[in-house]
Amino acid sequence: REVELTCAGRTDAGVNALSQYVSLPVTDEELELDGGRLLRSLVALTPDDVSIRGLYRADAGFSARFDATSRRYRYRISSGEARPVLAWDHAWWYRGQLDVDAMGEAATCLVGEHDFKSFCKAVSAVDKPTCRFVSSLEVTRVEEAGEKFVAVDVCGNAFLHNMVRTIVGT
């Protein structure tokens, strides 16, 4: 049967979701299935690039998008002359060198509640509130799968369209 999914948040093109929460309506009959059977059924119906890690029962009317209390995004940036080998489609590549300490210091200015209108797609902010609360914004050096990256982790209650991408790119 066709089911309408509600995702906790959207991802920009080229961005991968890790721990994306999704809500969907289920019938009483489906609720009677044990969790393992329902999980196996859902896994069988999803494309190979989607992994379902667990199922959670929620109250009727729950929306993964509107009832979420926080969201977290991680952007990986590879810097230097060589393009990342294994993560070329999971990281931004910047040919220059990045001053991670300066980036981290600048990031602290964006923590807290601010009007982020300048950090979103202009048309998406028309007649809409643009104040958001960023609970943390950290810039760190990380190594994953043998490659070095600068990771930008942003946590907040909600984000405007392209807000996180613009913060990271600025």
Report residues per predicted region.
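Structured-RNA-binding interfaces characteristic of tRNA pseudouridine synthases
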Residues: 1-170
